């Protein structure tokens, strides 16, 4: 069981043939929600370069969480106002959680790992927020509804 003001959320997806499970642990603070830890496991067949694998997974987690937290795409006359990365807030360095990565090797087939960590980040974070606060978030970015520390 988690302590008061704590939440844990889980999400799973298949992305590009890679099964990915992500767990997000948060704490509700006076300054907003702090993402403490992310645990992620990805079944990629064969991990060819463990250091690169670890870094790609962590980058995907940060990218996915940043979009869930802060990035909104708005339109004017059918054209997106945000035209590149500098148009998005993203996740700040001080908001970046500890990320624990496990690569599951269940075969000889090599699969890509750059994108698969991104899709489960938002639902895992939303589930953690729900677990901690009882507030169900169904629209991104989440900073429209909650503050992040």
Language-model segments: residues:
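C-terminal catalytic domains of large/alpha subunits in multi-subunit enzymes
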Residues: 1-18, 23, 27-149
